[in-house]
C-alpha cells in the first residue's frame, strides 16, 4: 500500500498542529454595535467615556495623550488609545448607526461587558463581539455572540 502524501487532506490537521505556535500572545476583541443613537455616536465625550471605562475596568495603561478626531455631522468620531498592552481603536458612523471597537491586548484580561454597556450607553440594538486569541492558531477565533 503506498504512503499517503503529506499534503493529502487527511494529513492537514497534523501539518497545522506541527506549525501552530505553542504560546498565546494575548487577544483581540472586535466589537460592532449597530442600531445606535446617531447623536450619541457624534459625541466625542461619550465615546471617550466608554473607552476610558473599558481601560479602567481591564486595568490597562494608556501611553501619552490619546488622539481623537470629530468629523462633524453627519459623520462620527475616531479615537485611538495607545496602551502599554497594545491599543484600543474606536470609529463611529452615526449616518449608519454603527460603532466599531478594536481592542488588542498582549495579556489575558478580564472580560468587559460590551453587550450591556453599549446597549445602555450608545442605545445599541445589536452588539456583535468576536474574540481572537493571538498566536494560538489552533484556537484562532471564538465567537462570543452574534
Give the positions of each predicted feature.
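Polybasic/polar functional segments that serve as interface/processing modules
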Residues: 1-146
Amino acid at each position: 500500500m503506498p504512503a499517503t502524501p503529506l499534503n493529502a487532506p487527511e494529513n492537514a490537521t497534523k501539518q497545522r498542529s506541527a506549525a501552530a505556535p505553542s504560546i498565546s500572545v494575548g487577544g483581540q476583541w472586535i466589537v460592532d454595535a449597530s442600531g445606535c443613537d446617531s447623536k450619541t455616536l457624534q459625541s466625542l465625550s461619550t465615546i471617550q467615556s466608554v473607552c476610558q471605562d473599558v481601560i479602567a475596568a481591564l486595568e490597562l495603561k494608556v501611553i501619552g495623550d490619546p488622539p481623537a478626531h470629530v468629523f462633524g455631522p453627519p459623520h462620527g468620531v475616531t479615537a485611538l488609545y495607545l496602551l502599554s498592552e497594545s491599543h484600543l481603536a474606536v470609529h463611529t458612523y452615526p449616518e449608519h448607526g454603527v460603532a466599531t471597537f478594536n481592542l488588542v491586548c498582549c495579556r489575558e484580561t478580564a472580560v468587559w461587558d460590551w453587550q450591556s454597556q453599549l446597549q445602555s450607553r450608545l442605545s445599541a440594538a445589536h452588539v456583535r463581539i468576536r474574540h481572537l486569541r493571538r498566536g494560538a492558531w489552533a484556537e484562532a477565533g471564538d465567537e462570543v455572540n452574534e
